[in-house]
Amino acid sequence: MTNVSDEKRILIMAGGTGGHVFPALAVAKYLSKQGWKVRWLGTAERMEARLVPQHGFDIDFIDIKGVRGNGVVRKLAAPFKVLRSITQARVVIKEFQPDVVLGMGGFASGPGGVAARLSGIPLVLHEQNAIPGMTNKILSRIASQVLCAFEDTFDQVQAEVVGNPIREELIALGQTPKDAGAKESLKVLVVGGSLGAKVFNDLMPTVTADMSKTHLITVWHQVGKGNLQSVKGEYQRLGLDGSVSVAEFIDDMEAAYRWADVVLCRSGALTVSELAAIGLPSLLVPYPHAVDDHQTKNAQVLVKAGGAFLLPQPILDIDKLIGKLQILSSDRDELDQMGQRAKSVGVIDATQKVADVCIRLAGKS
């Protein structure tokens, strides 16, 4: 069952986190510019329900939740809920008649991927992380084509390494020469995600105060929802108002990346890919509770290239953080070289590569 009109159509499945949604949006925008009709499959409770319509794409919802780590009752009920969600996805596919289905992670990808194959529609998978999620591990066995961002991601199936699709404006930023002006102050961008990172919020005020005694440092700190007053108050208590900007959430990450000399952050797949494409040095603190510790493996891509320092959270303290920042503040040549080494592993054409695979398979359907 395929679309009988001349207009090519793609159903994209991605949701739950920005690490799934934003790469998928990059592909959606690329194909939309090529004249494709794009539709989304997600869940009503997750971030895709808000983000996808904001970017001008229609979205359908199915009723599905994750089961890993949940109670016995939910696990026993899970097979019946999955069957229902597969049926819901098949209804969407029958109505939309896509030429190809692209799964990029999130709860909807599992039922949607199965529904695509049952409907005879080519299924393309893209895995953003260095360790695949459970859904993509399962779907990789029935997919028409498996794509991934990093080498050695899949053991059991052959996957093409294409990188992670990132926003056009960030790719352009990576092609723009850094300001060669005076660099008296080390500009540190601190990003802990939309909810912030407690470890960054706890440590950075003291780190900044101690660093300021011997080095010039300026901080732009995203503290996360609900943390603004407490973290800002601590910076103020330490007399750092003039050298620190504190925000609950940074809307313009392009501006933040352009401003920064170094980034202190988690090592989600999209973040790692953005840092590499732009060529930004980083201090990476993997989220210690990530499934299968995949953020540590993501980080290794930049660490092995020499573009980042790895700082595991269980051993992270004020002294270790100050030590790394002092190295970068004192040796600007090393800072610049770290940026170049990060850029050496960046992939800037991932969006086109993913889109090209979808176009090719749609032509065969």
Curated annotation (Swiss-Prot):
Pathway note: Cell wall biogenesis; peptidoglycan biosynthesis
Pfam families for the chain: Glyco_tran_28_C, Glyco_transf_28
This enzyme's EC code(s): 2.4.1.227
Protein name: UDP-N-acetylglucosamine--N-acetylmuramyl-(pentapeptide) pyrophosphoryl-undecaprenol N-acetylglucosamine transferase
Main location: membrane
Membrane topology note: Peripheral membrane protein
Gene field: murG
Annotated organism of origin: Shewanella woodyi (strain ATCC 51908 / MS32)
Family: Belongs to the glycosyltransferase 28 family. MurG subfamily.
Xref: CDD domains: GT28_MurG (cd03785)
Residues that coordinate or bind UDP-N-acetyl-alpha-D-glucosamine: 17-19, 129, 167, 194, 250, 269-274, 295
